[in-house]
């Protein structure tokens, strides 16, 4: 055993390996390949509108365009533990395909008529040349600028290079770049999320954006894998407080289980449970005064959009109160008012409080938590 190394909880002979290398590459699975090759590369994944707020706080309608692309550079090398965007990407997407998708999105929403904001998501970094052709990047930047729309795109922190950010700022001044920080903690980034960068990289990226007059939006992940509910509530609250001064907007994304990911695997083995909606309400209440100090300008804007809220694969409660609680959280993201949570109550709130109390006093392995929906007898069966 002298030559044994540790991989997770098991000692194996030979060279140490990454967690992802212990799991069959999901992008090579027959089902995954069939799905990816089945969609039309000239049509966007989805296009829709939502209520939003402009940078100055004015209510508006935002168009969201999610495109089918070649995916994210980090996924090609390793990938995050929780991200299933590789399910919607394919290697053979060309510039012509992306231009066709962009045209289809504009046609679907009548050239974004009535929308003051446009969000363009590419399952990776919008302005990374290896992911998306430069001519298509320029088309999106210049057209949205000419339309007078506020543009939001996404990027990885380590890809926010000085020269590229300067180019983006020239083509669309004042746009917003959303960075997937996920956690303001280097250990969580490395061991829970497998993000591939550290917090100082995020800080450097934010400084670069602000130096060129662009807005910085930071994504945080609520309840990364291998973390209990109580720890998630404490850590995310702390992270919001720590990054508020450097972020024009903070978007907290509660974990939702995406297919063929590491999180999907541990979820199916009942070693992970998505967060409670009550935890999100409590988190908002805990940080509201830090984000919106009384009598002072707001330090940032807090956005919480629970994807798949109310389902067993998304943030959920007992099932009877999910719709009402999730709607209140969504309304807060637009209004920024704690009055949205007035009158919310359910019997399951006591169960949530008990779980938080246990999490903060006793170790809970892998953040498994309690089943809120599963039949007790079924829970005894093998996964």
Question: Where do the PLM segments sit?
Answer:
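Acidic (Asp/Glu)-rich catalytic clusters
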Residues: 106-113, 140-146, 166-174, 207-213, ...
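Core AdoMet radical
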Residues: 84-132, 144-160, 174-202, 249-251
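Structural recognition of alpha->loop->beta junctions
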Residues: 80, 172-175, 234-251, 322-350
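Auxiliary Fe-S-binding modules of radical SAM enzymes
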Residues: 1-35, 257-383
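Conserved C-terminal portion of the radical SAM core fold
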Residues: 200-261, 280-306
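Distinct, well-ordered alpha-helical segments
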Residues: 130-138, 161-170, 229-230
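Canonical Radical SAM [4Fe-4S] cluster-binding loop centered on the CxxxCxxC motif
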Residues: 37, 43-100
């Amino acid at each position: 055993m002298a030559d044994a190394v540790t991989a997770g909880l098991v000692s194996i002979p030979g060279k140490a390996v990454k967690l992802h290398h212990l799991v069959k590459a999901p992008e090579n699975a027959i089902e995954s390949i069939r799905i990816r090759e089945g969609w039309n590369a000239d049509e966007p994944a989805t296009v829709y509108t939502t209520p939003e707020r402009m940078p100055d706080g004015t209510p508006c309608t935002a168009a969201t365009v999610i495109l089918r692309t070649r995916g994210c550079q980090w996924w090609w090398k390793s990938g995050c533990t929780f991200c299933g965007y590789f399910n919607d990407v394919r290697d053979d997407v060309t510039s012509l395909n992306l231009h066709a998708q962009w045209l289809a999105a504009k046609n679907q929403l009548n050239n974004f008529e009535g929308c003051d904001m446009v969000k363009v998501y590419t399952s990776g970094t919008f302005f990374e040349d290896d992911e998306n052709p430069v001519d298509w990047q320029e088309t999106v930047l210049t057209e949205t600028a000419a339309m007078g729309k506020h543009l939001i795109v996404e990027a990885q922190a380590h890809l926010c290079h000085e020269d590229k950010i300067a180019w983006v700022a020239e083509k669309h001044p004042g746009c917003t770049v959303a960075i997937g920080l996920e956690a303001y903690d280097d250990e969580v980034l490395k061991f829970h999320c497998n993000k591939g960068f550290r917090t100082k990289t995020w800080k450097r990226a934010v400084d670069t954006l602000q130096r060129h007059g662009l807005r910085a939006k930071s994504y945080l992940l609520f309840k990364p894998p291998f973390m209990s509910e109580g720890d998630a509530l404490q850590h995310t609250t702390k992270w919001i407080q720590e990054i508020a001064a450097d972020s024009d907007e903070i978007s907290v994304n509660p974990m939702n289980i995406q297919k063929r990911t590491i999180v999907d695997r541990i979820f199916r083995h009942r070693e992970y449970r998505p967060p409670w909606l009550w935890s999100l309400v409590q988190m908002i209440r805990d940080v509201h005064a830090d984000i919106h100090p009384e009598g002072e300008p707001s330090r940032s804007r807090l956005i919480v959009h629970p994807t798949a809220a109310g389902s067993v694969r998304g943030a959920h409660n007992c099932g009877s109160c999910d719709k009402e609680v999730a709607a209140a959280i969504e309304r807060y993201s637009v209004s920024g008012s704690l009055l949205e949570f007035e009158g919310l109550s359910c019997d399951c709130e006591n169960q949530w409080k008990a779980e938080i109390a246990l999490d903060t006093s006793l170790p809970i392995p892998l953040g498994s938590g309690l089943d809120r929906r599963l039949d007790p007898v079924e829970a005894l069966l093998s996964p």
